Regions:
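Alpha-helical bundle segments that constitute or directly flank the non-heme di-iron/ferroxidase center
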Residues: 15-20, 35-65, 94, 159-170
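Helix-loop segments that flank and shape redox-cofactor active sites
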Residues: 25-38, 55-86, 150
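Acidic, low-complexity proline/glycine-rich segments
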Residues: 1-27, 208-215
């Protein structure tokens, strides 16, 4: 029997909602080139605003880390919180690269990803899709500076990062599988000119992305196991805290896909 891990436990919860969050009609339409440029533009613009919350959560999580006073050897991976620090630094680099990629594709395919009003600064609430508003609430609940648990103070933030990256990868991997069925259709014939099938889907399903997700998964599971051990009370506490984040995250992810 496989040993217990936190992430494998979370994946047994809310399976129907996980399926809805990773197999939406929006994804199916993206895979077959049936999304219009205005719809993709609005969704991408919201996804870009999601990135800003992601960046703020990274900063908040960095503040929870208790880094060791003792130096870490140059060729050593370091303890859990040092490894989490390294992952968060990589996450910041990746999210900035992703935003530049968004802008490059948008410019080449004629997609408008600017949601700001006449002032060029603010975004009216009605311009935000339901999923973005839910993510902003979720990120905000973890970045308000409130005192967290003394047991694994980084837990909720790490679970949220793993969960959002895991669901995103699984969603676009499912879309990639659907796209393979439309392989005979030229991307230039797609309603978006090929932006999804040629640019975005390959970018969101590559090997580097899944390795990035799996790295955090390993850090999260090992960090929890180090603290929990065989203590069933601590295990239950960690499961409950993580499950609450997982539930809210799935709701936000499901709501992030527009109706088509």
């Amino acid at each position: 029997m496989a040993s217990w891990t936190l992430t494998s436990h979370l994946l047994t919860l809310h399976r129907d909602q996980f399926a809805r969050a990773t197999q939406s009609r929006f994804l199916a339409h993206a895979a077959s080139g049936k999304l219009s440029k205005p719809l993709i533009s609005h969704w991408l613009a919201n996804d870009r605003l999601y990135m800003q919350g992601y960046i703020r959560l990274t900063g908040s999580l960095l503040r929870t880390l208790q880094l060791p006073a003792k130096p870490t050897p140059s060729k050593a991976a370091g303890g859990i919180e040092v490894r989490l620090l390294d992952w968060l630094v990589d996450a910041l680099v990746n999210i900035r690269r992703e935003e530049r990629f968004f802008m490059d594709v948008a410019e080449r395919y004629g997609l408008d990803v600017d949601l700001t009003g006449e002032d060029g600064v603010s975004v009216r609430p009605e311009r935000k899709i339901a999923g973005l508003r839910r993510f902003e609430e979720l990120f905000g609940g973890l970045t308000t500076g409130r005192q967290g648990s003394s047991l694994l103070p980084w837990l909720e933030g790490a679970v949220l990062f793993w969960a959002t990256e895991k669901v995103y990868f699984e969603a676009w991997s499912w879309a990639k599988g659907q796209a393979e069925g439309a392989a005979g259709k030229a991307c230039e014939e797609d309603e978006d000119g090929g932006a999804m099938r040629r640019e975005f889907i390959p970018n969101w399903t590559n090997g580097e992305f899944i390795r990035f997700v799996e790295t955090l998964e390993g850090i999260l599971n090992e960090g929890v196991q180090e603290v929990v051990g065989r203590d069933e009370r601590l295990k239950k506490e960690v499961e409950d805290r993580a499950a609450a984040v997982w539930r809210d995250l799935l709701g936000a992810e499901e709501a992030f896909w527009p109706e088509v």
